[in-house]
């Protein structure tokens, strides 16, 4: 997951500017035993009556943890700037390069990721466009009506969000929000606990970190990447995201986590539904656009016509089908994925008007990639050209063995991604020493990449930064879902430890 729109409001704007309002609302909720709404800034955020406070009225561990995180973990842009300073000082202290030489190193690396950043930007936008199409939305809405019970609804929701997020994180985000809102509206009164529903949407997004749309495996599989020479060539997706080892790991998570959420759901008498206010907001129809052909100018008729985009889109999909048939899945790289998403998006939207409108909306998710990737590339230049990568590689070797190294990478990445929520962007600066240490220990590069990706998914479960789209869309607070996602975090840590300490890398 890369590049959340840095212009989005932080959850702290909703909560900590008016904490006293939330506390008063919480006390009122306890008195009347009903779900309530608390006003935070300009947004209404729903809360569960048995939310983060305990019976004595004290702030719970989840609320204190959330407050600490939101008070002290800044925006990712601040992190990358701070990392630049820290790495510069480390290189100055630990390598023979002086200040001007280090600035030269920084400049050498600054534009190394330019091509990759553009590729990721296109992938994020096109994935959003596919999920934002009318056929996908209408299909998801129809699927919501199939299950009848809270249990079956929650399991179905988790499975669909997990699968789509694994395929493409931006599409998974859209699917989670579209389906989640529809479920909240249509399944009121069946015992489906709203905080658990939102928590399950966010938690199942964790599977994206081990999917084929993630930065690390895509970078290693794409020709001309900056690591190609150091790792001895390209590493196909069949050795990383599509490897038997990682597929078994992801499949086990996919099939077990939904049942944990079922177990975490309270009884029907204690389950919390959305309020009437949120119900009205979720069901408000957008203004209808006048598309009567007789009222359109000739240019507008072409914009609304299905013919131009459909011809190009179908042609692209024929090429993709031929590519897979003749070259195989192992040859798929970032460019092929983007090409396929372009074609699918064109076919699903039909008209240029709909396609372009969706693209404009999806562009907002890419600002982090556009602005931050050059900064990460500059840090990469500092680490590689100054010799700092050799120093850090030695540190890793001093605490690792061939059996424990992959697990150490998992834990290291989990910790780093909690404090530096870059969504995989920082792989560019960590790859030189993480991969080099693994190579010296005889660990396959693909297995190191798999461990790195797995650590990223774990951190997201307890990091509120990436929860912002869910918090704003579903009108909840992070501490309302943290108790549930924290349980999944502990479970996933145990699974990852077993996988990378016990199971063979070549599974």
Can you say where each PLM-predicted feature lies in the sequence?
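Hydrophobic alpha-helical transmembrane segments of multi-pass integral membrane proteins
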Residues: 1, 146-179, 370-386, 397-436, ...
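Membrane-core helix-loop-helix motifs of multi-pass transport proteins
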Residues: 15-17, 179-273, 467-499
